A protein has these predicted regions:
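Structured, active/binding-site neighborhoods that engage oxygen-rich ligands
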Residues: 1-104
Length: 104
């Protein structure tokens, strides 16, 4: 398996896990058990009004990955690149998607 395939698997696995866990993220076990049975959640359920919805955690994971990729490209082209700053800028772009006033 190539590095790119492993990276894609990590991103997909994170998103799928987030979508499975989002409906129960802030619930206590007795509430989860009452809604989904003793086995807990085992299939996609509604979160934020959407079945299989991802949360802000997956959104930020993807924006962080985009920042890492952008930093890699900048570094590969021998441009000055401060990786934390590039990732910070990527996360600021995420913040603007959350109806937050632009800080970029």
């Amino acid at each position: 398996m190539s590095r790119v395939e492993r990276i894609k698997g990590c991103l997909l696995g994170g998103a799928v896990g987030d979508a499975l866990g989002a409906p129960v993220a802030f619930l206590e076990w007795p509430v989860i058990e009452a809604r989904f049975g003793v086995q807990g959640i085992s299939d996609f359920a509604q979160a934020y009004g959407i079945t299989g919805a991802i949360s802000d955690a997956t959104q930020m994971m993807l924006f962080t990955a985009e920042g890492l990729l952008r930093a890699f490209v900048l570094g590969s082209s021998r441009q000055l690149c401060h990786v934390p700053s590039v990732i910070h800028h990527a996360l600021l772009r995420w913040l603007t998607t959350q109806d937050h006033p632009s800080v970029i």
